[in-house]
Regions:
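The beta1-alpha1 cofactor-binding region of Rossmann-like NAD(H)/NADP(H)-dependent oxidoreductases
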Residues: 42, 62-74, 107
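Conserved NAD(P)H cofactor-binding loop of Rossmann-fold oxidoreductase domains
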Residues: 92-99
């Protein structure tokens, strides 16, 4: 899969060892120019510098994706750097935390989970859609198996509800942007094998590899998936 000449924006890719690092490398290895976005400036610069050291095309941008003005400014910077043409947006920003039983939960945690998992996605999509229309590009969002029917979600009210709302947002975008040629899809991966997850959940948990997730993201952003939109793809 050749992606030379394409510009790809990836959010939430600052932390070393996480899936975003592998997804970004997969795009860059195939010739794409990647714009890495995270609120942690030093971390996202480290990820970008590693790609640059390998002779790949990368730029690091820091932004608070929960702030509408900051996201609009981010999109403007990318617009200026790409002549207004972005081919793919991969939104990995988010976070997981148990909120406990509903009757005992903290409303502040509910708000926090919706902010990091839903509001950031909405604001990022809103800001970058004009740039994606120019290329009939693709958007990929990271959902969760916790948002799917039959999932075991006890103690996860805030997280599961936020991710469920995210999947609905993806449906809305897919329907609204169909005529413009912009595609929107979501992944619902199983637990991803990272050092942090293994430490938290143990080595015997059934994991999906970061590389397997990256391959699905690449496909959804490629011309091979040009007729696929509004879908939730499970990765196990």
């Amino acid at each position: 899969m050749e992606l030379a000449g394409r510009s790809v924006v990836l959010t939430g890719v600052g932390r070393e060892g996480q899936v975003g690092e592998v997804v970004a490398r997969a795009f860059a290895d195939r010739g794409a120019r990647v714009f890495l976005v995270d609120r942690m400036d030093d971390q996202v610069r480290a990820r970008s510098d590693a790609l640059l050291a390998a002779g790949l095309r990368s730029a690091a941008l820091s932004a608070d994706l929960s702030d509408a003005a900051a996201v609009d400014a981010l999109a403007a910077r990318v617009r200026d750097a790409t002549s207004g043409r972005v081919h793919a947006l991969v939104h990995l920003a988010g976070g997981f935390a148990a909120s406990g039983p509903v009757a005992e939960s903290d409303p502040a945690e509910w708000t926090r989970q919706f902010t990091i998992n839903l509001t950031t996605a909405y604001l990022t999509a809103r800001a970058f859609l004009p740039l994606l229309r120019a290329t009939k590009g693709a958007m990929v969002f990271f959902g969760s198996e916790a948002a799917l029917p039959g999932a075991r979600v006890q103690g996860l009210a805030a997280y599961a509800a936020a991710k469920s709302a995210l999947l609905t947002l993806v449906q809305v975008i897919a329907q609204e942007e169909r005529d413009a040629g912009v595609r929107a899809n979501a992944l619902a991966p199983a637990a991803i094998r990272t050092a942090a997850n293994v430490a938290d959940m143990g080595a015997d948990t059934a994991y999906v590899t970061r590389e397997a997730v990256a391959e699905v993201v690449l496909w959804l952003c490629s011309d091979a998936a040009r007729s696929v939109t509004g879908q939730v793809v499970r990765v196990r």
